[in-house]
Amino acid sequence: MREKVYLKFEEMPKVYYNVLADLPFELDPPLDPETNKPISPEKLLAIFPEPLLEQEVSKERFIPIPEPVLKEYAVYRPTPLVRATFLEEYLRTRTKIYYKYEGVSPTGSHKVNTAIAQAYYNKIAGTKTLVTETGAGQWGSALSYAGQKFGLDVRIFMVKVSYQQKPFRKILMNLFGGDVQPSPSNLTQIGRQFSEDHPGTLGIAISEAIHTVLNEKDAKYSLGSVLNHVLLHQTIIGLEMKKQLEIIGIKPDIIVACHGGGSNFGGSALPFIPDVLSGKNIKIVAVEPESCPSLTKGEYRYDFGDTAGLTPLMKMYTLGKDFVPPAIHAGGLRYHGASPIVSKLYHERLIDAASVTQEEVFEAGKLFAKLEGIVPAPESAHAIAYVIKEAKKGDKESIVFTLSGHGYFDLNAYINQ
């Protein structure tokens, strides 16, 4: 029989986990680029609502999930933990492989977890319009869905290469009421600085979104990754995963998730950091593209989160704000930087990181689709590629990874491989 672990809604976590409460060190604060001193909350209020800024700096271990957010989560959560038995048999490995499947969400990825929370907190703060960026379109789809749930207008700058590669993502965003523009665009002074054939980057799209917010009343910026409060909302993944593993008596040797800005990886990994700190033998691995290796080849220093330098300076692993990654199909991982939390954990060697090639990614994705019956998003297939390498060794009892989304909007990528 297929081994699947489902939680009842009543068993779903009713709180988010804040890893900042348990870390034995402080994060370096975001800096105001004008003064190189810690940025004032007043400046951040120009782009973020107060409730989310409070979460950004909170040291409370657990943050209650509001009832309206839980109500929306009930549409698709808790998500299943599944044993990949067909993959195990194919690899002839003694290692048990489990995956936490986030592709059952309304838009097909983990991004909805924070989109719903951010839409709710913006709504109660009086925001009328949310402006954001998106790479592969997963985040833009999620925020469009969440925005219409809470009566907010949503405007999206989508990285141009992904806008061209993934036309059905645009249709989905439009279906949920989102207004989507390719970035660089001619709508902002920042976008107009780039040539028409520029592929775009998440850094440029972020700049265009923030520029729009700063020039529009009742609009706030919404980010789908990197920031503390985003990873906080995503910890519902790891908290559920922990409960599900306890039910079947599995103590994972390795926990794996793909890494771009850090939302999926952080959400999966952070609830297990207390176990690492207490000395338990768990290896936690962030897997990124070889062509955009922020953690494995980046520098740990202060840098802007966007190309134009409109964000505060953040201490993180970075390839540089002007880095233009190749036009790979995993658009959600084409980011020059990384979450400050994930960066600090990696710097302190509490987590590991690895990179894989696009060829390895699509080989793994195709294999997983044939064996397990789910076409993984190219981003998620990075984790699968790493898991396959590790499972072939056969020296671990169990590996758990997060399948952060399905790839049914990314089939063009599979055709071209």
Swiss-Prot record:
The enzyme's E.C. designation: 4.2.1.20
Keyword Isomerase in annotation: no
One term under GO cellular component: cytoplasm
Biological or metabolic pathway of the protein: Amino-acid biosynthesis; L-tryptophan biosynthesis; L-tryptophan from chorismate: step 5/5
Modified residues (N6-(pyridoxal phosphate)lysine): K111
Pfam families: PALP (PF00291)
Enzyme class: lyase
Catalytic activity field: (1S,2R)-1-C-(indol-3-yl)glycerol 3-phosphate + L-serine = D-glyceraldehyde 3-phosphate + L-tryptophan + H2O
Any one GO molecular function term: tryptophan synthase activity
Top-level taxon: Bacteria
Cofactor(s) needed for function: pyridoxal 5'-phosphate
Keywords, in A-Z order: Amino-acid biosynthesis, Aromatic amino acid biosynthesis, Lyase, Pyridoxal phosphate, Tryptophan biosynthesis
Family: Belongs to the TrpB family.
Subunit: Tetramer of two alpha and two beta chains.
Role summary: The beta subunit is responsible for the synthesis of L-tryptophan from indole and L-serine.
Protein name: Tryptophan synthase beta chain
Organism (species): Fervidobacterium nodosum (strain ATCC 35602 / DSM 5306 / Rt17-B1)
Taxonomic lineage of the native organism: Bacteria, Thermotogati, Thermotogota, Thermotogae, Thermotogales
